[in-house]
Amino acid sequence: MDEWVMERYELAKERIAQIPDEKMAEEPYCDFFTKEAMFLQQVIHVMDHGIAGKNLEELQEQNHELYQDILPENYENSYGNPAYAQKMLGEYGKVFTFLYTELHGTIAYAFEKKAWDLTVVLELFLEIYSAFTQEEIPAEKQVKEILVSYVNDYCQDMVENRIREAIDPENNFVVEMIMDSDLSDLSYLYQSGEYVSENELKTAEFMNSLSQREIDEMARTYTEGYRMGFITGRKDITKKKTVNIRYHLGFERMVKAAVLQFREMGLQTVIYRHALHAVNRRNQFRNGFTGGIANPQFDYDHRQDSALFLDPDFVKRKLRAMQTSYDEYADLADVHGGPAVIETFGEKPFSPVSKPESWAFTEAQQKLQLELDNESGQITNRYIKGEERSFTIIAYPIPEIGEDFPEIFREIVKINTLDYKKYQKIQQTIIDTLDTCEWVEIKGKGENETDLLIHLHTLTDAKTQTNFENCVADVNIPLGEVFTSPVLAGTGGMLHVSKVYLNGLQFCDLKLVFDCGQVIDYSCSNFETEEENRKYIEDNILFHHPKLAMGEFAIGTNTTAYVAAQKYNIADKLPILIAEKMGPHFAVGDTCYSWSEDTPVYNPDGKEIIARDNEISEMRKEDVSLAYYGCHTDITIPYDELGSIRTIDDEGDMISIIEDGRFVLPGTEALNEPFGK
């Protein structure tokens, strides 16, 4: 520990220990400071003494105590709840609930022994506490200024640390935890400081019940998918030295096997935790290693906490910090291969409560956030080049999915390892038909009001070119789909799904209306008012873009996954990674080729996929800031809501690919076999 940081830490620790007994702040503020000082003392104890010597029961008790304040049963009376904070503290509610969230991140810093990260947050707490012990309490504006100064003062350090831990394999806390722990002893789960629920415990127990061969095969499917992503993309994996594993606590046995398999490929593993400092957090999404989510409503309530400090000065400051940090670690960035992601699913679908007391972006801040996302994406791509990196994603269920968890898990393993050659051949039949037409019509059935017309690119040489990628199991596991980037001009109509689960959030009766390939109207039925429903979509699908293009049209072919979802009644719990293979899907946002449009991509038959651009991405040639959205959200129409998919040629003649939810194109009949089982 740096001597200067150590000195500051000791002073902060000593002062915080005095707060619960001195009662120097007035009520109602004294209650906040007393409770948070007591919480911070628990964190400091972990920092100083660790968890050595504690048995499993003691570790579980400690974990519960650290997170109990935001658990659903206690959240109504927590200062982490913006509604409660405002009720108790009035106009100060927003600044105190922001502070609460920043304090909450100290749990992880203590477990990782990140002295600097912990110390600067302790000092922030003490600075605000000190202001409230004076004769005259500070105005809300003054408290906000203290918080903004904290963010601005430490922006460079926090951004630099975040970038380095994403690409530097040295001093990697989570990797060391995995490789050095006895994974048969479930007490290892508590070493990270993440919340441990029954899901994480039972997942680890289940993983321990599998043979080493089963674990190795699961890992091999995943790591080979990553390697094949480079091969099919004609990218040189030998130039790369690191891979970033992102996963959910409980899967350590599989991750350990993957780390060893990546080593055989010449890749060292980097694992970073989801962001905790407000400077680095974005929305409610957790990008990186995570444990259980103690309360998704807490994460949702604080998704726009950056509204406290987001202004033009901060945007410039953060972009400058990113640029200087990537300059500093350019060599590490250049040899980084990209992410290998293990997603989980099975949680009870979450429909959030919208709270006016939460921080929320103004219209001006929405534009600033878009600018920040766009510019930061460009900076990242200059150092971790899109045309040289790849990725892979795979998903597994967690025990919360239900009593059939073991059977469902094994079914998903089977789905993740389907015969790709069989699907590749069938999908080529679909592509050959699609390549004969200029338009595709998609219609729903029953109460599904989908009615879309998709405009395809013109092939100048049908012998060497194709519009659709034949996607089996490499970067996107499981197989299979055929997908393209539509021409926006002429693409339009309504996309409608009765229920869909996107980015951890449930959408009911979702409708998107397209014109010239862009969303021009939208609605859902999650909330009572149209205004709330539109805002929900703006926050979580459109991400505040005035218009969002259809970046992808695809036909999913994994009927085995669909039938399994119906058998176990888990369709509403599947991640889009699997759900997108269970019917046609449409992505709003960037194309699948963003930042690498100029890199030729080929199907197994040798044909070049020429539909890598649309009218938006082509703007990069004139002004790259106009070419990308920084988002890509897939929305699937399940087979049981699907009326038809038909091609339309220049003469207006149609060929059916799917009718009444079943494949009818000659050569695709085998895809219907799972329906009969």
What is the predicted function of each stretch?
Residues 1-489, 658-677:
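Active-site bordering "gate/hinge" segments
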Residues 605-677:
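Extended hydrophobic packing segments that form well-structured cores
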Residues 582, 588, 596-602, 613-622:
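Glycine-anchored, exposed beta-strand/edge motif detector
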Residues 507-524:
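Active-site and channel-lining beta-strand-loop segments
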Residues 473-511:
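Conserved AWS/pre-SET-to-SET junction and N-terminal core of the SET lysine methyltransferase domain
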